[in-house]
Amino acid sequence: MAQLTQDCFAFGKKLIKLETALNKIKKNIKPSKIIEEINISKSLNRIVATDIIAKKNIPPHSNSAVDGYAIIYNEYKSGNRVFSIAGKSTAGHPYKQKTKKLATIKILTGAILPIGYDTVIMEEDCIIKNKSLVLPNNIKKYMNYRHLGEDIKFKNKVFFSGHKLRPQDIGVLYSLGVKKIKVYTQLKICVFSCGDELTSIDKPLKKGHIYDSNRVMLVNFLSKLSYKVQDLGILKDNKKHITKKLNNASKNNDFIITSGGMSLGDEDHIKPLIEEKGEMHVWRLAIKPGRPVGFGNYNKTPILGLPGNPAAAFVTFLMLGIPILKQISGQKLIKNNYLPIKINFEHKKKPGRKEFLRVKLSNKDNSLILKKFHKEGAGILSSTSWATGLGIIDDDIEELKEHDRINYISFSELLS
């Protein structure tokens, strides 16, 4: 089970910058060291636990990149232009006989080249006369020739420890003949929502109640990221009830995520319980939306307390939750690729906090431009569905004008 070190970060009324919070957290969480070996067919989105070294060359032999005719270039270079056709080499059925001088082999794409043959002329560029191949004067050595190991060389590192496997990566491993692979075990993560006003979708909605959208959103995010997820339902605004549920969750999971209950209201119990049962490492970030977010440990189990407002929960999960989970799960952290893109709107904000706008990347007059959702509140969940990513406005900026540039990052990259 993933655990935190016992260091506690000092915090007070001052808001913490997101970057500061992440740096503090990264220093105090221990990546998973539990490794298992699994079939490569079941390795999608799993994290490689040891460097993978190529045990063979890919391709394993020199072969033809096209359908055509193979020759020995030095014979052509000597001035010869007419070659007798000795035989045929096809994929899976190489030509095995010895060849005479000035002989060509008809060859199909992917077929092995006979020893010494190093140049292939495309069939449509060839002239056949009297059962012989007649070549033009513009042939170059190694035309259409795939060298042994030109894709992957024997003993080269193919993937480093910490790499998250994608479909194309699995294809590469199959090409190398890898059947099983060592990966870090999947984190077991449980998700709660907090609040007496929340209702599950299978129950009728009472006056003053809302359906619990945060929990299902987070569960689906985590499933997409290939964690083992347990949906533990809604926590009532009752300290005794919450304590019992969190006690059980901390015994059976590697990580706990809650939404709601992180502010200072009379019925906000999550933060006080974290402080009572463990440590609150980070609380209240200088961001919008998502200020009432916290991270700590509950009975030595890492716990992330997200805001109750759905758009705020969405943003803080992407910007704080995912980096934490990546590190604990053993995934190599790669710096986000932010793109400076022009905006088609004006915007004002308070200095001292970073803002994350839900924006859509569009193409106008062959130029990329960002559009902002028409409402910005922390409770506007529809903005997250409309948007393609986040537009980030730095702490010190107070005003943006149309055609200014802001940093943009897509949801797909954040979830990669």
Predicted regions span which residues?
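Conserved active-site and cofactor/substrate-binding residues in soluble primary-metabolism enzymes
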Residues: 13-20, 35-42, 66, 80, ...
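Solvent-exposed alpha-helices and their adjacent loops that cap or buttress functional pockets
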Residues: 62-64, 77-78, 96-100, 113-115, ...
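Structural signal for hydrophobic packing residues in well-ordered secondary-structure cores
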Residues: 26-33, 51, 113, 156-163, ...
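Short, glycine/charged-enriched hinge/interface segments at domain edges or termini
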Residues: 2-13, 55-57, 69-231, 374, ...
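Short, low-complexity N-terminal leaders and the immediately following helix N-cap/first helix
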Residues: 1-79, 131, 333-358
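Helix-rich terminal scaffold detector
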Residues: 1-6, 10-18, 179-306, 310-316
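Flexible glycine/proline-rich
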Residues: 19-22, 36-41, 50, 92, ...
